[in-house]
Amino acid sequence: MASGDVIVKVADKETLDRTYANTNAILAAVGEDVRVKGVKRYGLKINKNDSNPATRCTYLFDAVGMTPAAMNYSTGAFDFGDWGDVFFVKNNYPAMVRYDGTEDYKLDPNDHTKKADGTTASDVANTAYGGNAMSVFDGSSDKGKIWLSQFEIGNYEYMIISNVQYDESYNDDAYVREDGSHADKLYYPMFGGSYDGTRIRSLAGQTLMYNTNASTEITRAKANGNGWNIGSWSKRNLLDCMLKIMSKTDNSQTAFGQGQTSGYVNDASQNYGHLATGALTNKGQFFGYKDTTHEVKVFYIEKWWGNRWDRINGLLMVGGEILAKMTPPYNLTGKDFEKVGITFASSGSGWQKGTKSSRFGRIVNSTGGSSSTYTCDYFWWNAGITAVALVGGSCSNGDACGADCLNLSLSAGLAYWHVGASVFLEQPIAA
């Protein structure tokens, strides 16, 4: 045999037949497994060098060719495009949830003042009810949890959602309980947090809670019972990604509604202009207005931006350096948080321009944009303190508000007219 000759060994027929049979068996098993057979990936690629909030976004994987979702301001109806039957949209529903975490009953999706039967009155505005109105994302059984992958390559950022953990880059941080176990459902508040004298509530027809510091907000949220707390960065980031992928734009206000971003009055007797909760109980899963005087609603959640700032866990600025913790337990000092690789000097503010996508979500890393470019939202920071994240903006912030609107300039001890928090729930572990 000459040097350099290649030897190819061919298995005998019996071995080949066994391999063929085994392969067919594996493929058949995979075909019968809905969780594998029905794998979906909906991705968005964002060009950092394109300042246009719409053209900078390109669909990837199963999202390619889909019509984006957006509010139709001419008809006054939300247009789901091709997204109405996507798992994280169709498996989202409004429900009343007891303090112990038990789902009591579903609400009529188009009129939350009624139960799902469309006739029986609900407790959505009943302060005597022992629980809260929550937006539920059901990932149980074969429905599929919302797995998220975020990263960047060169001048492109990527956010991809799947109904399975497609590979190791996909996380379910928003589902992680304080004991480290993983839930199958997510519970977001349908309404901005109000206060009943004991606890933060998510109910319609209530005055928003404000002028509270972080410790008070957390204490009042936890007063609902085990598993209740204020919001977190991982939950905020996940839902923001869902909105961006659905709408194929970085301008959340154009796609979903401006939100109440005006109306401030310097009068405590008028609650400084904050709208009461429940303005959109008869407006379905998504709804918004082009003007600045009405609420916005996404995934049955009112006030995702505007009206009042919401303080959240899991994102801090300590000495100018942004730190994140994607799963509980949380604290207000930065202990056990991780560096996200973004640092700002001194203090300041500006329209967001650059953003960084990583395992820690998508976070602003430079300013210089405008209300109609890049993320179209504003950022405040203070490098001289330990700042706790505020998100969404208030009724005095105008175009600065939005899904990406972020404030890292105020300490945990700050209590002010435009700051409060809302109540979230981790799914209880089944008995």
Regions picked out by a protein language model, each given a short descriptive name:
Residues 71, 133-180, 227, 347, ...:
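Carbohydrate-recognition beta-sandwich/jelly-roll modules
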Residues 318-329:
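A short, polar/charged loop-to-alpha-helix boundary motif
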Residues 34-136, 142-144:
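GGW-centered surface loops in extracellular recognition modules
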Residues 40-50, 235-237, 261-273, 281, ...:
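C-terminal, surface-exposed recognition/capping segments
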